[in-house]
UniProtKB/Swiss-Prot annotation:
GO CC, any one term: glyoxysome
Gene that this sequence comes from: ICL1
Name of the featured protein: Isocitrate lyase
Pathway as given in its UniProt record: Carbohydrate metabolism; glyoxylate cycle; (S)-malate from isocitrate: step 1/2
Record-listed E.C. numbers: 4.1.3.1, 4.1.3.30
Cofactor(s) required, per the database record: Mg(2+)
Lineage: Eukaryota, Fungi, Dikarya, Ascomycota, Saccharomycotina
């Protein structure tokens, strides 16, 4: 086959692939030829693509039934094997990886300053464990006659799809392409990426979040899909927006962000940066410097343009104040994507004069623009991201059902088919946020709004911490009575297979391989005569 014929065949295969229902709602800005020309000669099949297909079908079924796949962040293979018995997806958290699994071995808060391969490595760690326990289970079941297997419980599906945290992509667009490739190669079925700026990225529940313009994040989503297309993967992409609580943005270049960029409304206040530099030159620092900034904020009257317009109307002698404000707000809304120049021109036409509004004056010392997000801001971004993402996720400050409903309805009014994701964050105080009864139904209520995938980011971390604290305390006080009574016996009572940890770890499976390659005879089998796990045969 000629080089050209091979290329033509590749293009036709890609066209056929993209015409499947899987991509019905996906927008691509490049052609099949673009992808085919960037593929290698050898096709490397990715098992993670099978997992992506599995995840997509799983979420389709949940959407159909108005239910949700709900899961939490897994720390290690022990947690994954236990989760697989009850939950239908697995989450890998960047926060947990930052604190417990950085490839630099240096723990850190969730600032995405760990090495780029940290979360992909954790995905591979869990993916290999999933594959191993799946093989182990198959061998154990198939070693029995079919008549006996029919009496066993259904096998555990250890191959639950993994969704992982890609943070902001760890750099520019080429970094996003490479990071996506890592996740595909290491077993991820889906990844999420947020619209914060790299370098200033924070945990979704920290202060000081800096957004990138809408188009910049769309470019990241396109880069994810392009990378997955090059490597022949159906990887799911989840677009997260941190705009609900964001206070800064890197640039004013995208008109879709203009409504939410705040500016100074008092010309006499000057520029914040100039005022702060002057104060530093005077020797002010710490609390004194903060006081200077607070005073500038008070004097400058920093607000959004539509607020400045309303204040100007209300302060004037206009006879039709309500009508003027209503006419302006009818045309300039959180979802209208009105460029600032058009909003200013409309205001000038309605008032007969220009309003002083200067977002350059309000820029902070790092150069970022002031930004006032909120739920409608997140809706606007969610709609913009929808053509490039399989799911949309708004990070929020509280587990607020009314807010979740506002976001879901706002996005779905524009994009009815859109799947949504929700962070059931442990950063929320669930006992003060809602009653136990509401806690029990929260997932199902969100599912009815279209949140088909929900997750507790750090439940693996917190369950690990709780049992470790509880056992360490009891062990220090009661010695082996604590282990026997609070760990081992409950394992037996609950039927937790890890009580027989040698078997759980695959000792019998490996012994079987050893016998297979030695002709059926070996004196060094790990589970032979004398293994202490025989003590548990009557118990489990």
């Amino acid at each position: 086959m000629s080089e050209q014929q091979r290329f033509n065949n590749e293009v036709e295969e890609i066209k056929k692939w993209w015409s499947s229902p899987r991509w019905k709602h996906t927008k691509r800005v490049y052609s099949p030829e673009d992808i085919a020309s960037r593929r290698g000669t050898i096709k490397v099949p990715q098992a993670s693509s099978q997992q992506a297909d599995k995840l997509f079908k799983l979420l389709q079924e949940h959407e159909k039934n108005h239910t949700a796949s709900f899961t939490y962040g897994a720390l290690d293979p022990v947690q994954v094997t236990q989760m697989a018995k009850y939950l239908d997806s697995i989450y890998v958290s960047g926060w947990q990886s930052s604190s417990t699994a950085s490839t630099s071995n240096e723990p850190s808060p969730d600032l995405a300053d760990y090495p780029m391969d940290t979360v992909p490595n954790k995905v591979e760690h869990l993916w290999f464990a999933q594959l191993f326990h799946d093989r182990k289970q198959n061998e154990e079941r198939l070693s029995l006659p079919e008549s006996e297997r029919s009496k066993l419980p259904a096998p555990v599906d250890y191959l639950r799809p993994i969704i992982a945290d890609a943070d902001t992509g760890h750099g520019g667009l080429t970094a996003v392409v490479k990071l996506t490739k890592m996740f595909i190669e290491r077993g991820a079925a889906g990844i999420h990426i947020e619209d914060q700026a790299p370098g200033t990225k924070k945990c979704g529940h920290m202060a000081g979040k800096v957004l990138v313009p809408i188009q910049e994040h769309i470019n990241r989503l396109i880069a994810i899909r392009a990378s997955a297309d090059i490597f022949g993967s159906d990887l799911l992409a989840i677009a997260r927006t941190d705009s609900e609580a964001a206070t800064l943005i890197t640039s004013s270049i995208d008109y879709r962000d203009h409504y939410f960029i705040a500016g100074a409304t008092n010309k006499d206040a000057g520029h914040l940066v100039d005022v702060m530099v002057a104060a530093e030159l005077e020797g002010k620092q710490g609390a004194a410097l903060q006081a200077v900034e607070d005073e500038w904020n008070r004097k400058a009257g920093v607000k959004l343009f539509h607020e400045a317009f309303a204040d100007e109307v209300n302060a004037g002698s206009y006879s039709n104040k309500a009508e003027l404000i209503a006419e302006f707000n009818k045309k300039v809304t959180p979802l209208s994507n009105t460029p600032a120049l058009e909003a200013r021109a409309l205001a000038a036409r309605l008032l007969g004069k220009d309003i002083y509004f200067n977002w350059e004056a309000a820029r902070v010392r790092e150069g970022y623009y002031r930004y006032q997000g909120g739920t409608q801001c997140a809706v606007n971004r969610g709609i913009a991201y929808a053509p490039y993402a399989d799911l949309i996720w708004m990070e929020s400050k509280l587990p607020d059902y009314a807010q979740a409903k506002e976001f879901a309805e706002g996005v779905k009014n524009a994009v009815p088919h859109q799947w949504l994701a929700y962070n059931l964050s442990p950063s929320f105080n669930w006992t003060t946020a809602m009653s136990p009864e509401d806690q029990e139904t929260y997932i199902s209520r969100l599912a009815k709004l279209g949140y088909v995938w929900q997750f507790i980011t750090l439940a693996g971390l917190h369950t690990n911490a709780l049992i470790s604290d509880k056992f360490a305390k009891a062990y220090s006080e009661r010695g082996m009575k604590a282990y026997g009574g609070e760990i081992q016996q409950p394992e037996i009572d609950q039927g937790c297979e890890v009580v027989k940890h040698q078997k759980w770890s695959g000792a019998e499976y490996i012994d079987g391989i050893l016998r297979m390659v030695t002709g059926g005879i070996t004196s060094t089998a790990a589970m032979g005569a004398g293994v202490t796990e025989d003590q548990f045969k009557s118990k489990l």
